[in-house]
Curated annotation (Swiss-Prot):
Claim: Methyltransferase is one of the keywords in the record: yes
SMART domains, sorted: rADc
Keyword list, A-Z: Cytoplasm, Methyltransferase, RNA-binding, rRNA processing, S-adenosyl-L-methionine, Transferase
Binding residue positions for S-adenosyl-L-methionine: 33, 35, 60, 81, 110, 133
HAMAP family cross-referenced by the UniProt entry: 16SrRNA_methyltr_A
Transmembrane helix found in the keyword field: no
Upper classification of the organism: Bacteria, Bacillati, Actinomycetota, Actinomycetes, Mycobacteriales
Protein name: Ribosomal RNA small subunit methyltransferase A
GO molecular function: 16S rRNA (adenine(1518)-N(6)/adenine(1519)-N(6))-dimethyltransferase activity; RNA binding
Catalysed transformations (reactions): adenosine(1518)/adenosine(1519) in 16S rRNA + 4 S-adenosyl-L-methionine = N(6)-dimethyladenosine(1518)/N(6)-dimethyladenosine(1519) in 16S rRNA + 4 S-adenosyl-L-homocysteine + 4 H(+)
Primary site of residence: cytoplasm
PROSITE patterns documented for this protein: RRNA_A_DIMETH, SAM_RNA_A_N6_MT
Length: 316
C-alpha cells in the first residue's frame, strides 16, 4: 500500500529548488503561496481524517506539498491545477519524492470550471473529500462551486485566509456572520479546525491562515428537515423535502445576498426588492415565522431555508 512506502515530504529547500527549476515567481493573481513545512501538511491531513479509503480532490496542488501528505496517508488523489507549468511538473516531483506508485492524477483546469465530466474523462473516481490549500483570492467561490458540483464530497478541510475562515464558521448574530457563513452552512456543519502561521509558506503571506472543516449533511438529515437540530418541521403538505433542491439552493443564496447587501437594514427593507415590495417581504417573513424587523445577521441558515421555502411555495 502507498502509505507503507516511504514518501518524502517537501521542506523549504525542496520548495525553493523546485521554484528555481520552473523559474517560478508566485503570483497574487493565482493566489500562490506554497507550504514548505511537513508538519503543517500532516496536520491538515489529520484534521481532514483522510484514510486509504478516501478519494480526495485537491485544488491548487502547487509544488506538491499537501499532495504528498495525502498520498502518505494512502488516499487516492485527483489534483486540479490551473497553472500548466505546475501541472506538468507535479507527476515528476511525486515520483522523485517516493510516490511513484501512488494513485494520483492531475486535471489541468480552472477549479471554477471543473465538473463531474472532467473526472469521468480522466478515468478518476468521484471525490469523497476536498482537502486543499485554496487560492486565497477565490477561496469562497471555489469552495461553494466544488460543494455544489460534487455531491459525492461528504467532507471538506480547506486552508484559507484567517479572516475568511472566521467568516465561514461564524455564528448568527456575530459581526462577521454573513453571506459566506450562510452559503457554506447550507451544505453542512462548518467549524474552525486550526490556525496556521504565515511562516510556513513561501512566499509568506501578510496574515495567518485558518483551517475550516465542513461535514456535509446527509440527504434528508439537514437541520431544516428535522434530522439533526430538532428544528420544527414543516407540515407534510408544505415540506421542504418536496421542493426542487436546485431551486431551493438558488433561492436561499439570493435571499442571503439581498439580506446582507446593506446589513444594517431590517429584513423587511433589505428584501423588499426581492419580493417586490416591503409589504410582500413582511408577509413572507411572517409566514416563515421570522420577525421582519430583524437584520439578516440574526438569521441562521436554517431560517434562510425556511424563508426560501415559503417564497417558493408562494409562486407555485
Amino acid at each position: 500500500m502507498v502509505n507503507e512506502r516511504k514518501i518524502r515530504l517537501l521542506g523549504p529547500n525542496e520548495i525553493r529548488q523546485l521554484a528555481e527549476e520552473l523559474d517560478l515567481n508566485p503570483t497574487k493573481k493565482l493566489g500562490q503561496n506554497f507550504v514548505h513545512d511537513p508538519n503543517t501538511v500532516r496536520k491538515i491531513v489529520k484534521a481532514a481524517d483522510v484514510t486509504a479509503d478516501d478519494n480526495v480532490v485537491e485544488i491548487g496542488p502547487g509544488l506538491g506539498s499537501l499532495t504528498l501528505a495525502l498520498l502518505e496517508a494512502g488516499a487516492s488523489v485527483t489534483a486540479v491545477e490551473i497553472d500548466p507549468r505546475l501541472a506538468a511538473k507535479l507527476p515528476a516531483t511525486l515520483e522523485e519524492q517516493g510516490a511513484a506508485e501512488a494513485d494520483v492524477a492531475v486535471i489541468l483546469k480552472d477549479a471554477m470550471e471543473v465538473a463531474v465530466q472532467d473526472f469521468a474523462d480522466a478515468g478518476r473516481p468521484l471525490p469523497t473529500a476536498l482537502v486543499a490549500n485554496l487560492p486565497y483570492n477565490v477561496s469562497v467561490p471555489v469552495l461553494l462551486h466544488m460543494l455544489e458540483e460534487f455531491p459525492s464530497i461528504d467532507r471538506v478541510l480547506v486552508m484559507v485566509q484567517l479572516e475568511v475562515a472566521d467568516r465561514l464558521a461564524a455564528a448568527p448574530g456575530s459581526k462577521i456572520y454573513g453571506v459566506p457563513s450562510v452559503k457554506a452552512g447550507f451544505y453542512g456543519s462548518v467549524a474552525r479546525a486550526a490556525t496556521i502561521g504565515k511562516n510556513v509558506f513561501w512566499p509568506a503571506p501578510k496574515i495567518d491562515s485558518g483551517l475550516v472543516r465542513i461535514d456535509r449533511y446527509a440527504e434528508g438529515a439537514e437541520p431544516w428537515a428535522g434530522g439533526q437540530s430538532g428544528a420544527e418541521q414543516f407540515d407534510a403538505d408544505q415540506g421542504i423535502e418536496q421542493l426542487d433542491a436546485q431551486k431551493l439552493r438558488r433561492e436561499v443564496f439570493d435571499l442571503a445576498d439581498a439580506a446582507f447587501l446593506q446589513r444594517r437594514k431590517t429584513l423587511r427593507a433589505a428584501l423588499s426588492g426581492h419580493f417586490g415590495s416591503g409589504q410582500a417581504a413582511e408577509e413572507a417573513l411572517r409566514s416563515a415565522g421570522i420577525d421582519p424587523t430583524l437584520r439578516g445577521e440574526k438569521l441562521s441558515t436554517e431560517q434562510f431555508v425556511q424563508l426560501a421555502a415559503t417564497s417558493l411555495r408562494s409562486v407555485r
